[in-house]
Amino acid sequence: MTAILERRETTSLWGRFCNWITSTENRLYIGWFGVLMIPTLLTATSVFIIAFIAAPPVDIDGIREPVSGSLLYGNNIISGAIIPTSAAIGLHFYPIWEAASVDEWLYNGGPYELIVLHFLLGVACYMGREWELSFRLGMRPWIAVAYSAPVAAATAVFLIYPIGQGSFSDGMPLGISGTFNFMIVFQAEHNILMHPFHMLGVAGVFGGSLFSAMHGSLVTSSLIRETTENESANAGYRFGQEEETYNIVAAHGYFGRLIFQYASFNNSRSLHFFLAAWPVVGIWFTALGISTMAFNLNGFNFNQSVVDSQGRVINTWADIINRANLGMEVMHERNAHNFPLDLAAVEAPSING
């Protein structure tokens, strides 16, 4: 009898690590994007929690008037925020080792830059991880494409806008009231409500909510009854079942009669593509609008566009919005400037010394 002995193939430690990282059998898929995503998001989350609780006030405007943002310095959940990096730092990369001390780093708002840059890298890697897992499972890549909309929006307010304005101090604060302040100041300086890309974003978000509610209610109302009257209709569904769980023909007929025939989809695939594409495209446009307004390509200006035969201005809603913009403009950063340029009606006279 002849025995054939084969050398058992041994996998190197690196090979086993690669197999584990890219395995779709793990409870949570890691992937190569996850190798970068996990530490960056953990860093951003940890620093955010610590700074939100205990960070000292930050000199956001660079004029030695620190603004308090943490809970231990008098704020609550609604008023608290991570205050953006000081205008004195501008767009400079400001890690801890660039400051003379940790106290100086905190005073100049170093945590904001640290959190934002790690967060943006982390969410971009999360998007890449979505694509990677889809690829490994043989799925189409549209989940990552849909997620690109919130990634683009976050990148616009945390990175592109500060770059366009010349300072991270113009970025969106990481808190509830800080977000509202950012929105108000953005309207005052860029008239975002009159920008068509923002209008498309509003249509995307509100329209997406409407279509989601319509679709969910139509499906729930046209379930195929698999249970008795004494049981929940939801109990009639088995995970992975081959049969349709609702009657799309009934839903199509209902909606077609409610509005008109061609307002209703008769193709489930095109319907779900529409449900995904509508809000995604809207948010893409909003992110693009923020990115263009970052460089002061602002919303439409229809101020004083209607006059009577005598040349007197007849106010429109555009003029009312403009008046509100001026009020918001003079109220923010009130000690950082003596007189806003927006309110300077004529060019200042030259002074000959």
UniProtKB/Swiss-Prot annotation:
Residue positions binding a quinone: 215, 264-265
N-acetylthreonine: residues bearing it: 2
GO biological process: photosynthetic electron transport in photosystem II; response to herbicide
Record: residues binding Fe cation: 215, 272
Keywords: Acetylation, Calcium, Chlorophyll, Chloroplast, Chromophore, Electron transport, Herbicide resistance, Iron, Magnesium, Manganese, Membrane, Metal-binding, Oxidoreductase, Phosphoprotein, Photosynthesis, Photosystem II, Plastid, Thylakoid, Transmembrane, Transmembrane helix, Transport
Membrane-topology annotation of the record: Multi-pass membrane protein
GO molecular function (one): oxidoreductase activity, acting on diphenols and related substances as donors, oxygen as acceptor
Enzymatic class: oxidoreductase
Gene: psbA
Site (Cleavage) location in chain: 344-345
Residues where chlorophyll a ChlzD1 binds: 118
Catalysed reaction equations from the record: 2 a plastoquinone + 4 hnu + 2 H2O = 2 a plastoquinol + O2
Annotated protein name in UniProt: Photosystem II protein D1
GO terms for cellular component: chloroplast thylakoid membrane; photosystem II
Entry's transmembrane regions: 29-46, 118-133, 142-156, 197-218, 274-288
Residues that, per the record, bind chlorophyll a PD1: 198
Binding positions (pheophytin a): 126
Pfam families: Photo_RC
Family: Belongs to the reaction center PufL/M/PsbA/D family.
Listed SUPFAM superfamilies: Bacterial photosystem II reaction centre, L and M subunits
Highest taxon in the source lineage: Eukaryota
